[in-house]
């Protein structure tokens, strides 16, 4: 996907944009996170500092070298009245070795220490990042692609953007089944953006998608999907799930009262 650097919007940039509502350019800001957080502050005319002395605000973002000392100093500043802006609330971060704590987990640690929420959040699920991205492009028919319901899909819904959930990161088919919000499209990865999208169709006994079929077996309290690829089965099952919601409620899926059998 061709894109210029000027068309890329980061949560750090949006967090700093929010900070402008609370503090003027030239203010000294304590940085928690990586180089991207620091650069966003410098670009906006703030003094980015790793030393908490004389800082009037804290911008907390992700960085693999964030330490207990960073979180402690941020907590002390916030308790003393400093403005607190978080770049994002992603609780986890996928790595090659598995799922690791994300910025949201570090924000939660500070929240537990100071007893309050951040004054602003730059990234998803807040819609601020989506609004800025659509203005920068500008977007006429945007599609938000992400791997999380609680941040990506939630942000798209908040901003009125069509969403596509991919299974190449954090979310799994089990998350699709339990989610109380719905992605507009489902894909295995961003590769599905350049392949023909096979959508689900309602049938007499459930839903079909490509070579897959999904049926609700009420006696067993299960939706069973068979045939086709895993993605086709999941798309059919997800459509059937949402057709059943008005009859059985979302909690039936979120709490496992109606289970999903993908034949795996």
Report residues per predicted region:
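Asp-based, Mg2+/Mn2+-dependent phosphohydrolase catalytic module
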Residues: 1-9, 16-264
């Amino acid at each position: 996907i061709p894109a210029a650097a000027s068309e890329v919007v980061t949560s750090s940039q949006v967090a700093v944009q929010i900070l402008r509502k609370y503090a003027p350019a030239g203010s000294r800001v304590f940085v928690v996170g990586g180089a991207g957080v620091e650069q966003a502050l410098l670009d906006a005319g703030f003094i980015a500092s790793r030393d908490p002395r004389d800082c009037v605000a804290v911008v907390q973002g992700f960085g693999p070298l964030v330490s207990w000392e960073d979180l402690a100093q941020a907590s002390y500043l916030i308790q003393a009245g400093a403005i607190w802006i978080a770049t994002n609330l992603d609780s986890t971060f996928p790595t090659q070795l598995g799922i690791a704590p994300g910025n949201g987990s570090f924000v939660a640690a500070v929240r537990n220490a100071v007893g309050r929420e951040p004054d602003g959040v730059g990234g998803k699920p807040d819609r601020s990042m989506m609004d800025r991205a659509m203005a920068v492009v500008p977007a006429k028919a945007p599609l938000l692609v992400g791997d999380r319901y609680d941040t990506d899909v939630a942000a798209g819904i908040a901003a009125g953007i069509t969403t596509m959930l991919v299974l190449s990161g954090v979310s799994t088919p089990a998350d699709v089944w339990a989610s109380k919000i719905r992605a507009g499209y489902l894909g295995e990865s961003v590769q599905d953006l350049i392949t023909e999208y096979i959508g689900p169709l309602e049938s007499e006994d459930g839903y079909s998608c490509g070579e897959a079929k999904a049926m609700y077996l009420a006696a067993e309290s299960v939706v069973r999907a068979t045939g086709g690829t895993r993605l086709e089965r999941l798309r059919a099952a997800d459509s059937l799930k949402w057709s059943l919601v008005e009859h059985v409620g979302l909690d039936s899926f979120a709490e496992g009262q109606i289970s999903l059998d993908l034949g795996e």
